[in-house]
Amino acid sequence: MQRTNVIRLLLMPIAFALSATMASAQKPASVFIVAGQSNAEGRASTKECPHYLAKGYKHLKYAFVRTEQNGRFGHFSLGKTFAFCDVVNHFIDQKATTDFYVVKCAFGGTAITPAQTEAGKPIWYADSTWLAQNKPHNSTNGGMSLALSLTQGFEKCAEKTLSKLKEGYDVKAVLWHQGESDRSKPQQYYDNFKQLINFVRKEVYAVTGKEKDKRLPFIIGTVPRASRQYNPMIEEAQRKLGKELPNVHVVDLSDVSLQADVLHFDGKGTEVVGKRMLEKLVELGLADASADATPNTKACEAR
């Protein structure tokens, strides 16, 4: 009897370790959505990017659903420019032990409110009557709706890939940066952005069936105040949404540095935005990652 008890005591740590490993393996895959206009798409030169981004990603699976909505994820590598989400993804990737998924839909110079940009440019408008009369934007068929590009792109990703994951998947948040192109009619921004947030949440919930996705976290970055396209009424509307809608969180980017065009984040600014967005994800318990808040300026200069 004593020998049996000793064996049981010796085996207990092994059993706990195995159960912890199995629990980790069964944890749903994290999915992050990134959307907005040019500063979400990424305009900083990779010549200015922090050196750690050159290492690439081990666990990131990436789908850019603006150009096509085929439901396929692939590997991601930097091109001539980089975006704040590339920084976010790096630090999530560093802590990850399994694959995570990013669905991105961003297009430079795009507004939410109609008739704010040149004719033929797609918009983020989410009015139900307008959506019923328009198609999702993509590289093949044109189309005017970016809201449909995002939501139908996500639906395809779920159908073709995410729903087939043995461990399942969990949509963590939408990371959003936009507002410059709505500066001319800021009085309409609050209602139209609120409508868009509700639409995206409704469509994600329709796919996942998870009650929590009716309140899917929206993390909004403000427009830097030095931007030549800054309008305080846009920021006011974003902050009002952060107070009035559940699970909408505003990240203050008022002091972020810009390129010579006084519009787009420079390399340092892009890294700062990425780290602030990551910090909010971690604060909300939506990501397991950490990063030094100080911009990696030496690395940027040395690259």
Regions found by a protein language model. Give the residues of each.
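Cell-envelope and extracellular/periplasmic
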Residues: 26-303
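Sec/Tat signal peptide C-region and signal peptidase I cleavage site
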Residues: 21-25
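Bacterial N-terminal signal peptides that target proteins for export
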Residues: 1-11
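Bacterial N-terminal signal peptides
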Residues: 9-20
